[in-house]
Amino acid sequence: MMEFAVNFDGPVSFRYPRGAASDILKSIRTPVEHGKSETIYKGKKIALLSVGAMADKTVGVYERLLSDGYTSELINVRFISPLDEEMIERISSGFDYIFTFEDNIHSGGFGAILTQRLTENGCHALVKNFAFPDTYIEQGTRQQLFERYGMDSESLYNKIKDLLKNED
């Protein structure tokens, strides 16, 4: 992203969460294209959309679902603005379940914006946004906070499995 920002003719903003950056997707990265998301793994029925620092948690969920026999699509949402309209159009009709993962609060985040766009596109998928609650977040390490608010890979996986179980 830094190389993209240096070469982009216009303003660019980064969000740097506290802690070290994950390199979990480093070996499968594609060049950054302005306003475009990155499809890490193609899949069917379930789309997992990860924003920023949630990549490592989302990959953990993806791997657990894969071991259960679900071939989910894993998408790295590189840009919040502009949104990847082609990706939104594609997932609007191609999936039964769409899950977003972001380390922000629910209100006004990527998941809320995406849900609005999906609704406008007539999407009939079950959409669930995973984010922190719209409340004061207590102090703690990133790991402590993710676990406390159910945003760690294990908790996210269990929530999704419950949703899938209830839909079958």
Predicted features by range, described:
Residues 6-168:
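Thiamine diphosphate
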